[in-house]
Swiss-Prot record:
Subcellular location: Secreted
Coiled coil: none
Protein name: Conotoxin 1
Record keyword Signal present: yes
Organism annotation: Conus imperialis (Imperial cone)
Pro-piece positions: 23-51
SS bonds (residue pairs): 53-69, 60-73, 68-77
Sample GO molecular function, one term: toxin activity
Pfam families: Conotoxin
Gene Ontology annotations for the cellular component aspect, listed alphabetically: extracellular region
Free-text comment on this protein's domains from its UniProt entry: The presence of a 'disulfide through disulfide knot' structurally defines this protein as a knottin.
Chief location category: secreted
Extent of the signal sequence: 1-22
Tissue specificity annotation: Expressed by the venom duct.
Length: 78
């Protein structure tokens, strides 16, 4: 019974999320987040937004604004 209720709630949640994120047929990009909408208008913008990343061997962490280019940080970029 509990599993059935959990499955029912999960299906309702997924259905609601599909309707919330679905495109509007008149304005296809109206419901998308701001960053994604900008990337759809200018596809090269997503490539240009990869700024200020630290290369391998540079110091990284919570105090530094820029993240590692590869995404792996353990006090230094790996």
């Amino acid at each position: 019974m509990k599993l059935t209720c959990m499955m029912f709630v999960a299906v309702l949640f997924l259905t609601a999320s599909v309707f919330i994120t679905a495109d509007d047929s008149r304005n296809g990009i109206e419901n998308l987040p701001r960053m994604r909408r900008h990337e759809m208008k200018n596809p090269k913008a997503s490539k240009l937004n990869k700024r200020q990343c630290r290369v391998e061997g540079e110091i990284c962490g919570m105090l530094f604004e820029a993240q590692c280019c590869d995404g792996w940080c353990f006090f230094v970029c790996m």
